[in-house]
Amino acid sequence: MVEAKNIIVVIPVYNCHRYLSDAVTSVLNQPCKGIQIILVDDGSIDGSSELCDTLSAQHETISVIHQKNSGVSAARNAGIEYALSLCQGQEEASYLAFLDADDAWTSNFFDASVLDAMMQGYDLIGFLSCGCNISMTKRNEPTLLQEGIYTGGSSSIWIHASQPFCAMLYSCKLLSTYHLRFQTDLHYTEDKLFSMSALYLAHRILLQNKLMYLYRQNAASAMHTRCHGIPYFAPIIHGYLMVDKNMAPFQNSQREELVAGRQLACIYVMDMADEHFSHFGTLKAFNRFMQENVDSEELSALLNGEDSRIPANAAYQQLQQHPVAYVMKAYLKGVLLAFPRLCVKISLVKTLRDARRFPIAMNESTMEE
């Protein structure tokens, strides 16, 4: 039987003193009492470390791990290891969730219906998430899932495109059996690679249109989140190529070979090209990446359609055939985007953009409409 103690939440903490109490309170206030919380302080220097200890002293269900600053992936991995030690011998009945320190759960989420779902023994249970403004007084409309029961494997990988990593419950048995952990050498999309691996390895997956997760979005910075060019995209592309290789040993009659990582790597190469050129990067720098990158030969073959399962990338072929025209078009796009990028920094524009982006008012004290 699933009990509250079989639910474990890992919260990585790094310089998030302003929001940490809200995140923890959103778990403590759930109808299901006794949920175990693991706070992993990743070398915070803003008072978050001390706050973790204070919260732990106040609530017996809260444990704290202090470590030197090693990144969010290492913090989550430390939380996973500790969580598995807590549920040793009860992995089949235990579930792990992840909550970022500046986000929150909706109130009344962990009710009897969620506990009933957990008792069915699913490897993964996915729910809804939505973005909120900084004060968490307004939110947007979540994208609905195709509710139902799914079998893991390559056909289920694309669930991750609309299923945020944090709005899922992960069976501790799944994490333990396959030693699922986060890649510590990645600073972006490490959560996507983790969820892709989990979806591939899971046997049974349940998706429900029940709102679980609220994440803060800074509308002013949204237009700049991918404005990092080649240094930003290179590790992401490498990570997606690696996930296919990492899952290859688990291929069997029930799991087809995973190619989603390679497909996504191709998409991200062209996203990288668009970001690079629209911010007036040079063709020479892009070509250097394609020639000198550790994955260059594999990427070129994939983009040119040499793998029959992955169609040739039309945009890449256009770039190869008409490089000057492609780059000039991207430069023009960059010029057209320059004005909106400046405007979004204006306070009034931020307010108007927030109002449009987060139309649904919430009760701040209960995290509900």
Segments (PLM) and residue ranges:
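Short, well-formed alpha-helical segments that are part of the catalytic scaffolds
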Residues: N15-N29
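Short beta-strand/loop segment that forms part of the nucleotide-sugar
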Residues: G34-G43, S63-K68, A101
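A conserved acidic beta->alpha catalytic loop
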Residues: D41-L51, S70-G71
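Glycine-rich, basic loop-to-helix element that forms the pyrophosphate-binding segment
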Residues: Q67-G89
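Short aromatic/hydrophobic "clamp" motif used to bind/position activated sugar donors
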Residues: L96
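Donor-binding/catalytic cores of nucleotide-activated saccharide
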Residues: A101-Q208, Y213-P231, I267
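Catalytic core of nucleotide-sugar-dependent glycosyltransferases
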Residues: M212-N218, T225-R255, Y268-E298
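Membrane-interface aromatic/basic loop that binds lipid-linked glycans or pyrophosphate carriers
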Residues: F277-E369
